[in-house]
Amino acid sequence: MMVYNGSQLESVEEGEAVAVPGPPPEPRAPEPGAPVPEPGLDLSLSPRSESPGRGRPNCSPGRRKGRADRRGGARKGRQVRFLLAPPSPVRSGPPPAAASSSEKPEAPQDLGTPVQQSSLALSLELQAARAAAGGQFDAAKAVEEQLRKSFQTRCGLEESVTEGLNVPRSKRLFRDLVSLQVPEEQVLNAALREKLALLPPQARAPPPKEPPGPGPDMTILCDPETLFYESPHLTLEGLPPLRLQLRPRPSEDTFLMHRTLRRWEA
């Protein structure tokens, strides 16, 4: 970026300023002890010797305005040079002092390190109490101390005390004498109900069936007096009369007949 002095600006029409190229600013000579900055970090800026208030007294208002605008643009685009300090050598000495006493060092969190569990901590507390007592353990004092520290015991005592204080006096007094005579009927009835409850449920008998009504009268279809039946009368001369012979039947037919009659009745 190029920087121009006030003497290199010339006024043109309507007060506009035109930059006239001039010699570039010379960089500073490096100090003997300072390191040479890298090319990528060389943000140099030539200092301006003129202040915003200085200028030629015989300049016109338009030229003064253009010069002020030009100076503002040059001031906005200034560059800054950063002097990098030499890299400090690695110190092999002891680490710096610890922080203040208020900051406590963090304990190493190692999962392999054993920690005191509840039973071990309780045993250590018991050993410390025995050591403090000097070999003489006061059981009553220990119980009293434990009850005083126990949260559940304190809550239970508070509830009992609160319940006793909040109950009205009328509910705590006896209104009638309690009878010591055992009611026999009530005890027997209760025992009977318990026994009946243990019994399996009984099946209910089916309701009785209604007898069947009379059947339809078949005489309405015909007149009984006009009914005749014929029986054949066969006679054969010369043949002996027929003899009746009993035919044996199996014993199962009796039950079959009974079953058939029951089916007909149903």
UniProtKB/Swiss-Prot annotation:
Region annotated Disordered sits at 1-118
Grouped into one coarse class, the protein's main location is cytoplasm
Residues spanning the membrane: none
- The biased composition feature labelled Polar residues covers 1-10
Task: Print the keywords alphabetically.
Answer: Cytoplasm, Cytoskeleton, Phosphoprotein, Protein phosphatase inhibitor
Q: What InterPro entries does UniProt report for this protein, alphabetically?
A: PPP1R35, PPP1R35_C
Phosphoserine modification, residue list? 46, 51
| Single GO molecular function | phosphatase binding
UniProt keyword Cytoplasm, yes or no: yes
Task: Write out the annotated subcellular location.
Answer: Cytoplasm, Cytoskeleton, Microtubule organizing center, Centrosome; Cytoplasm, Cytoskeleton, Microtubule organizing center, Centrosome, Centriole
Q: Which GO terms describe its cellular component?
A: centriole; centrosome; cytoplasm
Query: Which regions are flagged for Pro residues bias?
Result: 21-38, 86-97
Question: So what family is this one in?
Answer: Belongs to the PPP1R35 family.
Cite the record's note on assembly: Interacts with PPP1CA; this interaction mediates the PPP1CA phosphatase activity inhibition. Interacts with RTTN; this interaction allows the mutual recruitment to the centriole.
Question: Mind telling me what this protein is named?
Answer: Protein phosphatase 1 regulatory subunit 35
Organism of provenance: Bos taurus
What gene is it encoded by? PPP1R35
